[in-house]
Regions:
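Short, basic (Lys/Arg/His-rich) helix/loop patches that form interaction surfaces
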Residues: 130-195
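Short, basic interhelical loop/turn and adjoining N-cap
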Residues: 49-54, 125, 176-185
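Short, flexible/disordered intra-domain loops and linkers
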Residues: 114-124, 162-168
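Alpha-helix N-cap/helix-initiation sites
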Residues: 21, 39-42, 126, 143-151
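Basic, alpha-helical nucleic-acid-contacting "clamp/cap" segments
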Residues: 61-113
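DNA breakage-rejoining catalytic core of tyrosine-based enzymes
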Residues: 1-14, 65-76
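Basic, Lys/Arg- and aromatic-enriched nucleic-acid-binding interface segment
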Residues: 10-40
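Short, charged phosphate-coordinating catalytic segments
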Residues: 30-57
């Protein structure tokens, strides 16, 4: 498959995740790719709680629906929940700089403990997450925004079903799966990928 602007395959996403140091950061990008975003300002991702993750049945509960986890997504999710130290960067002396996370937080996404965020137990805010995603995509070598990352995940699921999609097929599949995105845009990206 050729690379289409504004799209990454699952393989390309995994290659990008290797460049990230923190399981929490990998989880953020994987969650968006798997449509854990929300209607307004990534609210589903921001408010995702540890109790919403069901490792026994391999899914994440998001509102009224369940997001299945493959082995890789499940591994990253488990590592993100268990992560205790957040690495900012490794300096020139190969000393890792960062901070301890507050694992008493009920949220999967935890912030740097400060008084303004209840010592790291309050949920991340939208602006903070949006800026983080922008930086993570750049570090991972993915030239995407949140919408493009989410759309890439949708397209990846569709291409696993079949490769020859018509606009009507796309519209029907999106409607059946209750996904509200521009069908023609999805169709043109699939057409571009298939050459």
């Amino acid at each position: 498959m050729e690379k289409s602007k504004g799209y990454v395959s699952e393989r390309e996403l995994r290659e990008g995740l290797i460049k990230l140091d923190n399981a929490l950061d990998k989880f953020i990008l994987m969650a968006i790719y798997n449509r854990i975003v929300g209607k307004s300002g990534m609210s589903d991702l921001i408010n995702l709680k540890k109790k919403d993750v069901d490792f026994k049945n391999h899914f994440i509960k998001v509102g009224k629906w369940q997001v299945p986890m493959d082995k890789n997504f499940e591994k990253i999710t488990k590592e993100a929940i268990e992560q205790e130290y957040y690495y900012l960067e490794v300096n020139s002396s190969y000393v890792a700089e960062g901070y301890n996370l507050n694992n008493d937080s009920e949220y999967v996404l935890r912030t740097r403990p400060k008084s303004r965020n209840k010592n790291g137990t309050a949920p991340l805010n939208y602006d903070g997450l949006r800026n983080k995603v922008r930086g993570l995509c750049a570090k991972a070598g993915l030239e995407l925004n949140v919408s493009q990352l989410e759309t890439s995940g949708i397209i990846n699921k569709m291409l696993k079903k079949k490769s020859d999609w018509t606009v009507l097929d796309v519209e029907l599949w999106l409607r059946i799966n209750n996904i509200k995105v521009n069908a023609y845009r999805i169709y043109t990206i699939i057409k571009d990928i298939n050459g």
